[in-house]
Amino acid sequence: PSRPFVHQLVAEQARRAPEAIAVLFGEQRLSYGELDSQANRLAQRLVELGVGPEVRVAIAMRRSAEIMVAFLAVLKAGGAYVPLDIAYPAERLRYMLEDCGAALVLTQRDVLERLPLPAGLASLAVDDPGEWQDRPEGAPEVDLAEENLAYVIYTSGSTGLPKGVAVSHGPL
């Protein structure tokens, strides 16, 4: 790439200032070192689950420090994240989950219980450390290009149905 990707910039900052605070949410704090290390481990698990370039991963989580780990991990695995507001009605969430073609949903255990997951859609609870925290600490080796998707964000849509807008790594 002509310039580093966002997840590479975070890793660079983690090497430069690992103790500096990267995420502050209420009482939750993550240093750059912790954020990068946790995102690497989760990314390793995501790659094991088939995430890579152009693979979309929905993120349906309460706002928290760990949601930042999830966003970063998807980018490190080469996937494209699709943030979903869990306050939306079940019908709207189901539509977006089906429309975006997500291969996986990252969520939290209590949120998972009320998510309207389409049949066959796999999920991983980020707040279940047994799911991913024993993975290697290094970032997975992923071959990414600027034109690969980074994320898909849904707007309200003029037809009443949410409309997904895809953004690649280049403009990010």
Residue map of PLM features:
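Carrier-protein-dependent adenylate-forming modules in NRPS/ANL systems
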Residues: P1-L172
